[in-house]
A protein has these predicted regions:
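Alpha-helical transmembrane segments in inner-membrane proteins
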Residues: 1-248
Length: 248
């Protein structure tokens, strides 16, 4: 039942976060991982797994929060184009740190544990009740913020208004809460946050972001549900969700 719950949460959180990023930057290549959040989650998970100083979920959240704080400060000082460039470079740097941590794994068991998280699956191995409650709170806050700012983002995307840098930074923080609710538990699932929002914009020509929230959430949940059922009922073992999306 918890696995199905996180299929639903991931199917909503990642596409909605992707739609928000595309509207915030007015760019169809906008993605929840474009500012290095995915790389930061992987670095935090790797550090937590290899050191044992906290749970994998908490480590992932803390590192993603630090990354968001850095992006928050940068957002206050640069324009959109410069921020995207910074995000790509910053994400590459964080990813390199994660690689260094992983290649120095103390033993094979820890390396396997990290890999299974990084490959993304809904088995929720090693996830505690506290992790679940924490992620549900993040999801509720992030989704509420997405709905609250829907009209403002639509006007911003249409060029009717221009958000201040502070407003953009606060939106980034809200998107981080939404995305981390999924990534910290299930691992990074990249295709859902980029491909699904673009498919939604092909299907629906309206610029009302609320319609794309609905369409993207339905498509994302449906796609992840199919891949989860394939992984559960076909003897593939633990199969990465990001790969299952293409396999299915």
């Amino acid at each position: 039942m918890l696995s199905l719950l996180y299929v639903l949460i991931s199917g909503i959180a990642l596409p909605v976060g992707g739609v928000q990023m595309q509207y915030l930057w007015r760019n169809q290549l906008g993605d929840v991982y474009s500012l290095g959040l995915g790389s930061a989650a992987c670095l935090g998970a790797a550090a937590a797994t290899m050191s044992g100083w906290c749970s994998l979920t908490v480590g992932s959240f803390i590192c993603t929060l630090i990354c968001t704080a850095v992006c928050f400060l940068v957002t206050l000082r640069v324009n959109t184009q410069s921020l995207i460039t910074f995000g790509i470079l910053f994400g590459t740097f964080i990813g390199s740190l994660g690689t260094i941590v992983v290649t120095n794994a103390p033993n094979a068991d820890l390396l396997k544990k990290y890999y299974l998280w990084g490959a993304a699956n809904f088995n929720l191995e090693g996830v505690t009740a506290g992790d679940i409650v924490f992620s549900l709170i993040l999801f509720a806050i992030g989704l509420a913020a997405a709905l609250w700012t829907a009209k403002v983002l639509t006007r911003h995307f249409n060029g009717e208004t221009e958000l201040s840098n502070l407003h953009k930074a606060l939106l980034l923080l809200a998107i981080m809460f939404l995305v981390t609710s999924s990534v910290s538990i299930c691992g990074p699932i990249g295709f859902i946050s980029l491909g699904v929002p673009n498919l939604s914009r092909i299907i629906c020509k309206s610029t009302d972001i609320r319609k794309h929230y609905l369409i993207s959430s339905a498509m994302g949940t449906g796609l992840l549900l199919v891949t989860y059922l394939v992984a559960t009922h076909v003897n593939f073992g633990i199969y990465p969700q990001s790969a299952q999306q293409w396999q299915s």
